[in-house]
Amino acid sequence: ELKVNNSDGMLSWSDYKNLNANLANNVAWSVVESKETNLYAQALKWAELAVGLDKNSPYFLDTLGHLYYFTGNKQKAIEVQTKAVESAKSEQNPSLEFSTTSVLNKIKANKL
């Protein structure tokens, strides 16, 4: 397996991929929380990168769903947020399933 050398030592490609996906999602989510609308377009790119690296993370999908909604793409937001709910169900995480479902309902009602 490919190893990447960084300040923390040698990381496997999988570790490096997960680290970068988490960083990208965290940056995007911080913009969602800050409500800095002028940064939504850039945050959307970070969220898309995170989901590109981990297509099944309910957390990453949730962030992406929020940002599609906030950038005016309600249909895409519903599609992605539905995947977040399904992913949370598959992880058998009731609290995450509840929160992602709540967000999905708010998106559908235009109340996010």
Q: What are the residue ranges of the model-derived segments?
A:
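Alpha-helical adaptor scaffolds
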Residues: 1-71
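Terminal, low-structured helical/coil segments at or just beyond the last alpha-helical repeat
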Residues: 18-21, 38, 79, 83-112
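Short, charged low-complexity intrinsically disordered segments located at boundaries
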Residues: 55-61, 77-79, 112
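C-terminal structured "cap/appendage" subdomains that terminate the fold
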Residues: 67-68, 73-84
